[in-house]
């Protein structure tokens, strides 16, 4: 909201794209919800059934989103946008994937039925969504605190720094998962 309330100060970099405030806000919302829509299409498709393919594809899309946000918005806003995408996906994963699968499973148990194929598919989607949330946690925290460290975002290759830090933090999370 802060970035939208004063878009000319926070969101817009006129040397990149000479947006009006309304244009920048509309582009930002389209970028955010468009990214979430693409994620949902992938997670619900056959590509979302294989954790490796799914994770690889999401990583590639996040690299593209990182680069794209750096082309459109101020450097600082770019980091915040990637964090907002991660956060939106994480919330969507819980409300539109994990919780419905949990409800379906609990309903089967309450009725004394064995979960069928549909519930199994929901459970697989929920597992992959939960895995994404697990790996997105540290990169999300990094994007949240990044505004306090201009040396991370205040140059033309800041989008690449964002990608590398995302890889490093996700790798750290993977290491932690394997050891605990």
Where are these regions (language model features)?
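Polytopic transmembrane helical bundles with strong interfacial aromatic enrichment
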Residues: 1-180
